[in-house]
Amino acid sequence: MKETVVVAMSGGVDSSVTAALLLEQGYDVIGVTLQIWPKDAPEGAEGGCCSLSAVEDAKRVASKLGVPHYVLNFRDYFETEVIEYFGREYLAGQTPNPCIRCNRVIKFEGLLQKSLALGAAKVATGHYARIEQDSATGRYRLGRGIDANKDQSYALFNMTQEQLSRTLFPLGGFTKPEIREKAAQLGLAVASKPDSQEICFIPDNDYRRFLEERYPDHRFQPGPFVDQEGNVIGTHRGLPFYTVGQRKGLGVAFGFPAYVIALDVEHNAVVIGPDEAVKGRRLLADDLNWIDIAGLKAPMEVEAKIRYSASPAIAVISPVKDGSAVIVEFAAPQRAITPGQAVVFYRGDWVVGGGTIVRNLDLKLPEIRHPEPKPVKGVKAKGRV
């Protein structure tokens, strides 16, 4: 009897070819598109995998391949678990990655649960990554896709063993050009469809405007720009509009190439400094998930990535706080260690695990020195004779 697999079809070339490859491999395929765009999105809104046109593309591909296709309403679930999370973290001075959250909670938790109702024990997506089971330990492993330019293992680091055991990534052994060529051979209209480069629920990538429109009653409180010595050198618009490493859009000329080196949430301050000050060698991470190992018991040398686009860098990870957090110490300074972003650990092509960056341990927030108020002419300063 054929095994049934639910394929998450976004209307793009990757998920379309995923469905085709699984058919060729002898699976019974059910195509599913998740309806997750916000309820208040305009009818013609485009947002990558969330747009209405993407659903139509997925339907057409499923029809051409001869597989059933369903649209599942995940709006409320996505709203609560991804969009609200994104806003909450930004308002708290963090820089979250909503795609990582979506992968774990929506695609590989919510969709897996729905797949059982459709008679499928497994799901498949068009991610460029690999899964295999270690014959010695029995653990499921997550590996880089062979196309280094498209590898998505970083954004999948928080998958559980259960999720990995029930997931297929057919594209992990292919390059993107090979997938486009395969789509063309199959006569799929999406063969040349461009990749989505946006956060799906923020089509124009303007997250600042998104926050202002979504939280109109929230006071984006202005506060001080301060230098590394704590001197107040300007006024910012509100912490959610800045992120570590940012140079453009600061809104103030400082007389030198200025970068955001930290957000001081307690004092509502943005710390500014030169490019060199953005770098650090040590960070603290928590909210850990381990894949290749059951847990970290002793220091381990790995390659670590502190953002999706970063190159892996040699580091030693050491457990702290009874193993609920790790200190990551890099061999060389890393630029823009950003609280809220993921740090992912590799050995060779395989993901060891990862977590969420709490803070740059090499950075000490300055004590803010507010300027003395200027005396008003003709008025004696209080306490003086």
UniProtKB/Swiss-Prot annotation:
Keywords: ATP-binding, Cytoplasm, Disulfide bond, Nucleotide-binding, RNA-binding, Transferase, tRNA processing, tRNA-binding
Enzyme class name: transferase
Coiled-coil region list: none
Active site positions, chain numbering: 102 (nucleophile), 200 (cysteine persulfide intermediate)
Protein name: tRNA-specific 2-thiouridylase MnmA
Marked site: Interaction with tRNA: 127, 341
Family matches, as Gene3D superfamilies: Adenine nucleotide alpha hydrolases-like domains, HUPs, Translation factors
Organism: Heliobacterium modesticaldum (strain ATCC 51547 / Ice1)
